[in-house]
A protein has these predicted regions:
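Accessory RNA-recognition modules of RNA-modification enzymes
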Residues: 1-169
Length: 169
């Protein structure tokens, strides 16, 4: 019991309390596996006998699909991240311990380009703005990357000018 209390104090993610994307990060990896196994068993035991969850060698940066909301602070700084659980407030996240590193870099690059391309982020309250979300999917074996821009308008202004290529290769 004492060991469990200590492992729950070790937060490796500074955003975990607000973003809700990695609910198990406050536990040791072994405890995470136990909890996930119990959950799978609880919901599937009526239908099948679930196999034991396979351990990862390195349990970080494994998430191959990353969705980021974009917004702007009152001081004009562009932010990207996830919505705080149960709200429309964006938790600004620079990098995430469970998201693919290339996906994080791509989202950071897009965030950095917003000002130079004069792109307005979508405001949920006013319904005004262009960029709502970005979805990045990374093929772990193929290394292919899919980037989806979710816009608040069917028209992408000056779309012929977007010939930027990220250095994530």
């Amino acid at each position: 019991m004492e060991e469990k209390k200590q492992t729950q104090k070790k937060e490796i993610c500074q955003y975990s309390k607000r973003c809700g994307g990695c609910a198990f990060q406050g536990m040791s990896y072994e405890e995470q596996l136990e909890q996930k196994q119990k959950t799978v068993k609880k919901y599937l035991k009526k239908y099948v006998k679930p196999d034991t969850i396979v351990r990862m060698y390195y349990p970080y940066h494994y998430r191959n699909k990353v969705a980021a909301a974009f917004g702007r602070l009152r001081n004009g700084t562009f932010i990207s991240g996830t919505y705080e659980e149960g709200t429309h407030r964006i938790v600004p996240i620079e990098s995430c311990m469970i998201e693919d590193k290339n996906a994080d870099r791509i989202i950071g690059t897009i965030r950095g380009l917003l000002k130079s391309f004069k792109i307005k982020t979508y405001d949920e309250d006013s319904g005004y703005g262009l960029l709502r979300h970005v979805l990045v999917r990374v093929g772990k074996k193929s290394k292919e990357v899919l980037v989806v821009l979710v816009l608040g308008s069917p028209v992408l202004p000056s779309s012929g000018n977007y010939k930027y290529r990220d250095q994530c290769q």
